[in-house]
Amino acid sequence: MLPLLASMIVSFIPGSQAKAIRNVTLGASGLSAILSLVAFCTFQVDGGLQFETKWIWVESLGLNFHLGADGINIGIIFMGAVVAFASVCCAGDITHRVKEFYVLLNIMIGGVLGAFASMDLFFFYFFHELALVPTFIMIGVWGRGQNRNYAAYKITLYLSLGALLALIGLIGVYVQADADSFSIPDLINKVKEQSIDESAQKWIFPLLMFGFGILVSLWPFHTWAPLGYSAAPTATAMLHAGVLKKFGLYGMIRIAIPMAPVGAQYWLGILAWLAMANLLFCGLVAVRQKDLNLLIGNSSVAHMGFIFLGIASMNIIGLTGAVLVMIAHGLLAALAFGLSGHFYQQNSSLDMTQMGGLLRKMPLAGTAFLMAMMAGCGLPGFANFAGELTIFFAAWSAGYKLITVIACLLYTSPSPRDRG
């Protein structure tokens, strides 16, 4: 919660003191990254829910401010804190209305980390919405290009629709479970003891699947992502593509499948084919791009297909691979968009036809971008390779043999689909 505290501190600093504003934000995000590293290194694999913070908020409604970490979210929280710190480091290109930008950036970071750490259904959703609102404003006010307002409106429309569908699904879970608390662990335990009616699960799960899916850019609801990222400030693109986008995937793993397993079995076959569409169509669109940000954005959307396929397998191998690719892609997307922002500052253009000779002009940045491309291609030695290979095995064992064959062909094809 340090970034939210930093946003309040920054709001009291005069706007003329840009250096102090940046230092406060950098300090808060840096300390958050250090604390998340300590938590990650001291996490006990068999220890269940750890690092808990729980305050009773509205006892009559069963609302509690409940944070914690387990095997599902500890790696995502650590990745999110690292990406948040990196995004602050890359926000030096903001030169006007600096105070307002950093207030919103701190709120976005706090919302992102809070959403993944929340163990209460209400705060899980609240923190995500808290992070989304600054995204729209930052693209519209500090974005790049003539289409930034259109991009801001489009991302607002799509993500609001996704959030609304997810909210209806979450309310459905709460009502059908006849719960007296919003605690996610308690809800899961209650559903295990007395499962939600199967007919109810068959309409609750698609609401969650498509609601969370839109937030992740599931095909065909994906067109907001490349446009939004190409227009967004560097820090915003890094944070959203790297971390906030994983909220929907995390929601499916944490909530949708455990609370509506029968509905999941009914709908996950459809999700697997939509995942294939992410890989195929978005990969082909990425190959056609000349703008570096559009390439990275479409490539990022294509990567989501692997994660959706891992989730659709509905087995421990696939879910483990999905979480691993979520973490790897978060770091990869943040690195790619951060370097893209650096290239834009140096060249005032992201036209790839004019960007030859990067290694000669900028050896460090060029080498880092080369590593990002290699990781995006899933070469052995990078986390993407291990995660995606695991997902292939899981999808095959789950019966998605044709989809797995097609995915493997796309994975090994000599196209530059995964430069980002």
Indicate where each model-derived feature is located:
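Generic start-of-chain signal for non-secretory N-termini
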Residues: 1-8
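Hydrophobic alpha-helical transmembrane segments of polytopic
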Residues: 2, 25-28, 32-35, 73-76, ...
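A short, hydrophobic C-terminal helix/tail in secreted or cell-surface proteins
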Residues: 414-420
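Active-site-proximal acidic secondary-structure segment that organizes catalysis
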Residues: 133
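Transmembrane helix-loop-helix hairpins at membrane boundaries of multipass inner-membrane proteins
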Residues: 9-103, 180-193
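Hydrophobic transmembrane alpha-helices and their helix-loop junctions in integral membrane proteins
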Residues: 86-92, 110-122, 136-413
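Short phosphate-coordinating micro-motif centered on Lys-Gly-acidic
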Residues: 129
